[in-house]
């Protein structure tokens, strides 16, 4: 059956700021306390979405979350009106204010793990929300992510959206950023490659930075998504590269159809894994980048592998890259050699995503890939699909509500909270989502 990959990109939220919340993510740490530009961040993301939609790649949008997220501050013991809660936390414990104001839901590669209908036992598309257990600020996302996905994939005959795994370290799950699918045409059954950083009872794990994904979580997600057991491979990421800042697999590898583009040090027991893939995926091609040409450090600083590998109708592929790749002579030199070599990659497309990149999120972090048949695509909430009308409406919305400068101190401004809620109210109507945010269901959250 014919099917296409639809990229659902996260729209950057109104409180996008640099707080260095993500230990193990070196860009996040390096840019801590810099002044951010939420308006520019959102527009950079929108430009990528629109350019890819115009180039013929189906594209949709996932909206931001409510931030600052007052209900969690109340759970932490801050009381009073919303304004009083903000004032107290800013004075007594500003790090909590930063955490509950993170715009990290923009990186929707961590929103969920997807199984296309061609791979599942019941023939539905399955989406399992990630618990993002390793980081407090990201663990807050799961409930609203589930509401958003259910509002977008709202046809229960075709889609099953599963709640996140229990919030414990043993079941740490980071979603599609640690998941690849390999195979032929999108509508054919594919091989799902789940990548984990640690498993219980196995001493092979990083020592400097945390391994956020567990094998136990990956196995549970594969079960929830009803993936045919014959179409699953579990592989461990190389712990040495996690210790060099590769906090998700999509920082060191990207797949599309029959191609796996990865660093030669991406996986533990890599040669064994590639041999397994060759045996199980027709036409499998590994493009391994040698460390002598691109070091792990350069891969992390440029986000070479946090790219999007997209298929054209003729079977050729386009690699979508952040501007940092073009600005690095060694990486850009390698990429031009890649273009000239015998492989499906025939075009490089570069985007300026600096606002997201400074927090450690490149093109691949910003998108959730969902393979859909034509019938399934028609069943998706049509209001989220990118086109000229939506692009213009979202740009106008960003111009109306977003600040062009934000510091950590600004997060305590009650107007940021009020304006953010008004903005999301308008957006949820524009995208026909219903009441997906807690403040919409609780009358403003003054509890």
From Swiss-Prot:
Active site (UniProt): 174, 248, 365 (nucleophile)
Question: Per the record, what are the reactions this protein catalyses?
Answer: N(2)-succinyl-L-arginine + 2 H2O + 2 H(+) = N(2)-succinyl-L-ornithine + 2 NH4(+) + CO2
Q: Which keywords appear in this protein's UniProt record, sorted alphabetically?
A: Arginine metabolism, Hydrolase
- Asked if the Swiss-Prot or TrEMBL record annotates the protein with the keyword Hydrolase, the reply is yes
Enzyme Commission number, as recorded = 3.5.3.23
Q: Does the keyword Iron apply?
A: no
Q: In the record, what terms sit under GO molecular function? A: N-succinylarginine dihydrolase activity
Q: What class of enzyme is it?
A: hydrolase
Q: Which SUPFAM superfamilies is this protein grouped with?
A: Pentein
Q: In which pathway does it act?
A: Amino-acid degradation; L-arginine degradation via AST pathway; L-glutamate and succinate from L-arginine: step 2/5
One GO biological-process annotation of the entry reads: arginine catabolic process to glutamate
Q: Where does substrate bind?
A: 19-28, 110, 137-138, 212, 250, 359
Superkingdom: Bacteria
State the function annotated in the UniProt record: Catalyzes the hydrolysis of N(2)-succinylarginine into N(2)-succinylornithine, ammonia and CO(2).
What HAMAP family does the record tag this protein with?
Answer: AstB (MF_01172)
Q: Which family does it belong to?
A: Belongs to the succinylarginine dihydrolase family.
Indicate the quaternary assembly.
Homodimer.
- Give the protein name, as stated in the record: N-succinylarginine dihydrolase
Q: Which organism is it from?
A: Escherichia coli (strain 55989 / EAEC)
Q: What is the lineage of its organism?
A: Bacteria, Pseudomonadati, Pseudomonadota, Gammaproteobacteria, Enterobacterales
């Amino acid at each position: 059956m014919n099917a296409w990959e639809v990229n659902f990109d996260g729209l950057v939220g109104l409180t996008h700021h640099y707080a260095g919340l993500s230990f193990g993510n070196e860009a996040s740490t390096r840019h801590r306390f810099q002044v951010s530009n939420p308006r520019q961040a959102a527009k950079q993301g929108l430009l990528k979405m629109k350019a890819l939609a115009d180039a013929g790649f189906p594209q949709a949008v996932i909206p931001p979350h409510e931030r600052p997220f007052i209900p969690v501050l109340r759970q932490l013991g801050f009381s009073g009106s919303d304004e009083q809660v903000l004032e107290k936390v800013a004075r007594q414990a500003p790090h909590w204010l930063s955490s509950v104001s993170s715009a990290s839901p923009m990186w929707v590669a961590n929103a969920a793990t997807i199984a296309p209908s061609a791979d599942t036992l019941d023939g539905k598309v399955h989406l399992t929300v990630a618990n993002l257990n390793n980081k407090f600020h990201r663990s807050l996302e799961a409930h609203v992510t589930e509401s958003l996905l259910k509002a977008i994939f709202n046809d229960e005959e075709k889609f099953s959206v599963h709640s996140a795994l229990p919030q414990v370290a043993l079941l740490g799950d980071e979603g599609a950023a640690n998941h690849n699918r390999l195979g032929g045409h999108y509508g054919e059954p594919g091989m799902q490659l789940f990548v984990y950083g640690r498993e219980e009872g196995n001493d092979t794990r990083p020592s400097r930075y945390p391994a956020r994904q567990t094998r136990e979580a990956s196995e549970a997600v594969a079960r929830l998504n009803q993936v045919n057991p014959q179409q699953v491979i579990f592989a461990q990421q190389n712990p040495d590269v996690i210790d060099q800042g590769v906090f998700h697999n999509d920082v060191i590898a990207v797949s599309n159809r029959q191609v796996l583009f990865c660093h030669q040090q991406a996986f533990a027991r890599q040669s064994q894994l590639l041999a397994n893939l060759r045996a199980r995926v027709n036409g499998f091609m590994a493009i391994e980048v040698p460390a002598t040409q691109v070091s792990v450090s350069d891969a992390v600083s440029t986000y070479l592998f946090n790219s999007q590998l997209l298929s054209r109708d003729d079977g050729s592929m386009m690699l979508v890259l952040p501007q940092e790749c073009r600005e690095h002579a060694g990486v850009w030199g390698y990429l031009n050699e890649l273009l000239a070599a015998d492989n499906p990659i025939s075009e490089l497309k570069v985007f300026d995503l600096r606002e997201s990149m400074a927090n450690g999120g490149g093109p691949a972090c910003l998108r959730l890939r969902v393979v859909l048949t034509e019938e399934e695509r028609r069943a998706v909430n049509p209001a989220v699909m990118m086109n000229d009308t939506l692009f213009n409406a979202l740009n106008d919305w960003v111009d109306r509500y977003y600040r062009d400068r934000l510091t950590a101190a600004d997060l305590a401004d009650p107007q940021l909270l009020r304006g953010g809620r008004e903005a999301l109210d308008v957006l949820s109507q524009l995208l026909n989502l219903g009441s997906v945010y807690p403040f919409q269901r609780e009358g403003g959250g003054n509890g």
